[in-house]
């Protein structure tokens, strides 16, 4: 078995699509029968609108259906071979132990085999099978999903985004017009299903115009990258080496070459839609702590509305009367104002007094973003947020100059987060008078019309 498929076969696009589909469907059915007869337990088959998946005791084989839809074209064997190779590539970035290789099936549709002579009939992505109960949506429904798993997933995605390939301004990805067009098309398709979403369409158009400079800056700053594209809870899983994501979008690069905050917004929105805002805020806190991407908060509400609209559209395409679709539509409307109005909470106390623990509980309770002075201090010096630092005050990263730079960084974050309209908790000692200047706080209150508490 090879990691990548054999050279693409001659293009069979001239073969009628219905004939390709019937042959592939017969091949999958024959494999299921052969493998089930070879031993227990019987091989299961799962079907989606674009795939067949055969589940053996330890592995999964994912076949692309010969279909041509508005958003993908699997209408030839060459196209399906390419899609399998892309699925392997994009998913190995996050789950290398889960995505094993691409296998080619030879023989005939009535007697297919992985090994053998003759032309290739179909390709499949071979994966390691995992328990359904390991997936986030199932774990959440069963009451088994832990906060530490959510936070570990957020940190994993932050690392993934930091390592992902960066889009260039010469590419179409992330351009303000492209971002607006993607959201507009999603809402138009949602409206075509009969959903009442005129208010969402109007809000999104206004937001797109307002955010155009922000989206342009994000592209210039390297925040548009090759992400995952589909980070809802059914695509998140707890494996032996920790939580990660699978089933990234392989068929449309425009859906995964996106702003990293837009990518992560899917996780947050899906928790919110399921009534677990507390987990969404804990996930966002962990992501921001790992990434330092507070600038992404400016467009996050727009991203959340878009992600909720995507899930509402998918649900309505499956069932126009879906209660799930109504839930996502309600979530989209709520996300327009989520995390506001802006407010500022300053934690005060000695190091080790429990401020961070209190702040962590508070942010999940009131729906707020948190910035930690110690984490930002470490970030300025290239130290991991979770790494222990043992330098004395006045030495290492705790010199007077380092402290001044840290205060400047905190001030920058505070202004940016409040300007974006979010509630913010500043987790720092605030023991020095200049760190909690009433004059400065009054200025912030006046400029951003915020509530304020210590």
Where are these regions (language model features)?
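Single conserved hydrophobic/aromatic residue that forms the stacking wall/gate
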Residues: 54, 440-454
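N-terminal pre-Walker A segment at the start of P-loop NTPase domains
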Residues: 318-338
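Conserved substrate/cofactor phosphate-moiety recognition/catalytic segment
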Residues: 363-422
């Amino acid at each position: 078995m090879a990691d990548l498929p054999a050279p693409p076969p001659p293009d069979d696009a001239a073969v009628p699509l219905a004939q390709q589909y019937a042959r592939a469907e017969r091949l999958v059915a024959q494999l299921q029968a052969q493998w089930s007869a070879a031993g227990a337990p019987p091989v299961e088959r799962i079907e989606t609108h674009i795939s067949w998946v055969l589940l053996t005791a330890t592995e999964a084989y994912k076949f692309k259906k010969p279909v041509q839809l508005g958003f993908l074209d699997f209408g030839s064997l060459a196209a399906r071979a390419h899609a399998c190779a892309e699925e392997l590539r994009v998913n190995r970035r996050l789950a290398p132990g889960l995505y094993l290789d691409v296998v080619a099936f030879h023989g005939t549709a009535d007697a297919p085999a992985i090994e053998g002579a003759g032309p290739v009939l179909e390709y499949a992505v071979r994966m390691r099978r995992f328990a359904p109960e390991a997936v986030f949506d199932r774990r959440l429904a069963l009451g088994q999903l832990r906060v530490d798993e959510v936070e570990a997933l957020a940190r994993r995605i932050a690392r993934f985004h930091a390592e992902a390939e960066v889009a260039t301004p010469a590419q179409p990805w992330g351009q303000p017009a492209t971002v607006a067009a993607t959201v507009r098309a999603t809402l138009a398709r949602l409206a075509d299903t009969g959903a009442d979403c005129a208010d969402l369409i109007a809000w999104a158009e206004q937001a797109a115009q307002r955010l155009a400079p922000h989206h342009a800056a994000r592209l210039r700053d390297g925040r548009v990258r090759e992400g995952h594209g589909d980070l809802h809870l059914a695509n998140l899983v707890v494996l032996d080496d920790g939580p990660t994501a699978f089933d990234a979008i392989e068929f449309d690069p425009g859906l995964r070459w996106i702003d990293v905050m837009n990518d992560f917004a899917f996780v947050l929105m899906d928790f919110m839609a399921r009534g677990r805002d507390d987990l969404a805020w804990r996930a966002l806190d962990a992501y921001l702590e790992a990434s330092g991407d507070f600038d992404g908060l400016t467009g996050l509400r727009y991203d959340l509305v878009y992600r909720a609209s995507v899930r509402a559209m998918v649900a309505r395409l499956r069932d126009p009367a879906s209660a799930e679709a109504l839930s996502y539509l309600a979530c989209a409307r709520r996300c327009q104002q989520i995390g506001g109005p802006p407010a500022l909470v300053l934690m005060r106390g000695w190091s080790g007094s429990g401020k961070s623990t209190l702040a962590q509980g508070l942010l999940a309770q009131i729906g707020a973003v948190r910035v930690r002075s110690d984490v930002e201090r470490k970030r300025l010096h290239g130290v991991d947020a979770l790494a222990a630092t043992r330098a004395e005050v006045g030495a290492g990263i705790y010199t007077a100059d380092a402290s001044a730079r840290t205060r400047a960084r905190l001030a920058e974050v505070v202004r940016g987060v409040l300007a974006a309209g979010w509630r913010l908790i500043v987790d720092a000692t605030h023991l020095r008078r200049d760190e909690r200047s009433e004059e400065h706080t009054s200025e912030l209150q006046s400029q951003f019309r915020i509530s304020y508490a210590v």
